[in-house]
């Protein structure tokens, strides 16, 4: 519920004369390409960057950046003189009191016990320390944007990147805005997340910035996908092609516009790595860190770096290690991290965390504390997500059900093309085969292949089969390569077939 205080302050700022980005936001709205949720997230992003000076959340809350209760309102409340004086003089105390007094979605109060404790013993609570603990002691700007799947998180990332570059190029000395970007995808989702992140390269910056500025910035962009596996020779010395990709952009002092995407596990590995591409490296005294993880070391050298962490809620197991890496980048000798921006569809912890307030009272919350913007799934469903249509059949023959579905799809969408510059997209049908890989390969695939040929479609061009393979059927490597690079395809296959192995993902 801390994010509701941020949103309230953001709206007040945006409606004030102090806000100088109204014309920019009006332009974004006029293009008609961004959803309301994305526009509101961008407002929040710029509010934190400009009005809040890109400061860490614990500092902002301690300084009362999001407080809204006035002295007049406090004087009208039933408070003791000591409590009122404490709330008027201690901005962190007022922030906690305002937080605890908020109404929940169900109409209750966030924390009756905390408000009562502040009223009874206002001077017995170390308010600043509680804020530091609830934000994990982070001393840099670390903001989480929560939007459900399908709301456009990937394009929101792209918008943030172009907005930062726009302001950074106007004033290179302004450290609030990043010049280079690293996007970390969660380890378990690399086959699905990294490909979608590649769509950032296709984002049209004219959706958020007017021409010719948009095109000028895009021409300066450099995209690197750090997805290569290390290769080892007989000498037991390892070459890391991902490091080579970064090293080629030296010198780093003036580097601007690099967007690199990698898997989170590639920067939290602890194994010793010795590289052979020594001719690419600059001399450094940080030998121990460099040997621990070459890629981590080189990412840490990028100037004015913004770290994007996608699908934060999927990375809980490695969160401590990943946080430690980011802390090293942010607090190292160069202190080159401009901010850390997280994206998630579910801004909740698996279980509530308890932060001690006094010896006898703790504050418990299941919200991820650094959430600054939250767009609920229920709002997304009401505004733009698709409603499922469930059809019931009395026919028990599964192949006849498949035939009915495929024919209906082809009759309705066969020639439908979605023009979404710079690419065009075809309508797609996914067929999930719960009976296993053998049934998919031996029954479903031949059946649908013959079926779509009746409509003039070539099965080799319009069907992709996905499964991990078994002793009878090999894994379709062509599919994995295709799905990984599909962001660059001008037109995609119409049919995706999945076996029950897909449940693993």
Regions found by a protein language model. Name each.
Residues 56-81, 166-181, 185, 201-220, ...:
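Flexible phosphate/Mg2+-sensing switch loops adjacent to catalytic phosphate-binding sites
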Residues 117-118, 122, 134, 138, ...:
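P-loop NTPase motor catalytic core
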Residues 138-144, 178-179, 425-428:
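Pre-Walker A (Motif I) flank of P-loop NTPase domains
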Residues 71-134, 208-245, 277-297, 322-332, ...:
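Surface-exposed intrinsically disordered loops and tails
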Residues 147, 151-169, 190-201, 261-410, ...:
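Signature of the SF2 helicase/ATPase Hel1-core->accessory helical subdomain module
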Residues 58-60, 64, 151, 212-238, ...:
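Conserved C-terminal RecA-like helicase domain
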Residues 156, 174-219, 265-266, 432-445:
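Conserved Walker A/P-loop ATP-binding site and its immediately adjacent core
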Residues 13-146:
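Conserved pre-motif I regulatory segment
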């Amino acid at each position: 519920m801390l994010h509701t205080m941020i949103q309230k302050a953001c709206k007040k700022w945006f409606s004030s004369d102090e806000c100088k980005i109204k014309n920019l936001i009006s332009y974004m709205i006029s293009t008609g390409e961004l959803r309301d949720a994305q526009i509101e997230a961008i407002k929040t992003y710029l509010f934190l960057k400009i009005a809040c000076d890109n400061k860490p959340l614990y500092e902002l809350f301690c300084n009362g950046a999001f407080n809204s209760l006035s002295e007049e309102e406090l004087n009208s409340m039933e408070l003791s003189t000591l409590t009122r004086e404490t709330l008027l003089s201690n901005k962190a105390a007022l922030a906690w009191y305002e937080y605890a007094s908020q109404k929940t979605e169900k109409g209750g109060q966030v924390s009756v016990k905390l408000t009562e404790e502040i009223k009874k013993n206002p001077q017995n609570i170390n308010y600043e320390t509680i804020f530091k603990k609830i934000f994990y002691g982070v001393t840099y700007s670390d903001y989480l944007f929560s939007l459900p799947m399908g709301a456009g998180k990937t394009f929101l990332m792209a918008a943030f990147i172009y907005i930062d570059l726009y302001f950074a190029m106007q004033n290179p000395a302004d450290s609030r805005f990043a010049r280079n970007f690293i996007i970390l995808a969660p380890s378990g989702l690399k086959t699905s997340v990294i490909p979608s992140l590649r769509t950032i390269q296709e984002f049209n910056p004219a959706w958020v910035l007017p021409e010719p500025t948009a095109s000028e910035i895009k021409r300066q962009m450099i995209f690197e996908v750090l997805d290569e596996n290390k290769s080892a020779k007989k000498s037991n010395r390892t070459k890391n092609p991902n490091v080579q990709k970064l090293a080629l952009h030296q010198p780093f002092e003036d580097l601007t516009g690099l967007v690199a995407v990698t898997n989170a596990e590639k920067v939290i590995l602890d194994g010793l790595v010795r590289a052979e591409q020594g001719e690419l490296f600059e001399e450094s005294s940080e030998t121990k860190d460099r040997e621990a993880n070459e890629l981590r070391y080189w990412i840490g050298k990028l100037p004015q770096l913004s770290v994007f962490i996608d699908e934060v809620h999927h990375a809980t197991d490695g969160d401590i290690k990943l946080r430690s890496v980011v802390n090293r980048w942010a607090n190292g000798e160069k202190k080159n991290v401009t901010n850390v921006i997280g994206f998630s569809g579910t801004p909740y912890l698996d279980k509530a965390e308890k932060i001690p307030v006094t010896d006898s009272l703790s504050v418990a919350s299941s919200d991820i504390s650094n959430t600054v913007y939250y767009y609920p799934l229920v709002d997304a469903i009401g505004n733009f997500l698709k409603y499922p249509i469930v059809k019931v059949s009395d026919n028990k023959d599964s192949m006849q059900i498949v035939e009915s579905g495929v024919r209906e799809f082809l009759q309705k969408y066969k020639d439908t093309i979605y023009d979404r510059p710079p690419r065009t997209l075809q309508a797609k049908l996914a067929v999930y085969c719960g009976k296993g890989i053998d049934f998919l390969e031996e029954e479903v695939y031949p059946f649908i292949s013959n079926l779509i040929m009746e409509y003039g479609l070539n099965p080799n061009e319009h069907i992709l089969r996905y499964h991990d393979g078994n002793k009878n059927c090999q894994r379709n490597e062509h599919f994995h390569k295709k799905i990984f690079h599909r962001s660059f395809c001008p037109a995609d296959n119409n049919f995706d077939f999945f076996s029950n192995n897909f449940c693993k993902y």
